[in-house]
Regions:
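Small/aliphatic-rich secondary-structure junction motif
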Residues: 2-49
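Structural motif
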Residues: 4, 101-102
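A short acidic, glycine-rich active-site loop
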Residues: 51-62
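Glycine-rich, Arg-bearing micro-motifs that act as flexible, cationic patches
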Residues: 102-128
Length: 138
């Protein structure tokens, strides 16, 4: 999938902190940063009420805004790859991290909440990631 840094975000302060950390690390290492948002999760009525097209559009807008905000905060950016994917967050993050050097997650946001299968997304990623996992406090 990629040979750089993968960061999972979902629009919270912890996700923004993880993105900023990943972007700084990407600039230090000279590596691309893949910013991943799992859309279409059954976490609330607002998501269930959206069509797939609306959910993907909202996810893409959120990704663009998060990267722009992090770029301002960090003062630059490495090569950025944005991925908005439909499905279970842990599964998506683990797939994206297959060839990654690092997987970066924020603590205190949805990645720490119980996923559809009843397990913490961050715990699932720590247990099964093919690369080191960095958990950034939010």
């Amino acid at each position: 999938m990629n040979a750089g840094i993968v960061v999972g975000i979902e629009g919270t302060p912890a996700g923004r902190a993880a993105l900023e950390w990943a972007m700084r690390e990407g600039m230090l290492r000279g590596r691309p940063v893949t910013v991943v948002h799992a859309c279409g999760q059954p976490f609330g009525r607002e998501v269930r009420a959206m069509s797939d097209v609306e959910a993907r559009r909202a996810s893409a807008c959120m990704l663009d805004a998060a990267v722009a905000e992090a770029e301002r905060a960090v003062g630059g950016k490495p090569e950025i790859i944005e991925r908005s994917r439909h499905g279970a967050a842990a599964k998506i993050l683990l797939e994206e991290a297959q060839d990654a050097e690092l997987l970066v997650l924020g603590r205190g946001h949805r990645l720490g909440v119980v996923d559809v299968v009843g397990q913490s997304v961050s715990a699932e990623c720590v247990r099964h990631a093919p690369c080191p996992v960095v958990i950034i406090p939010g």
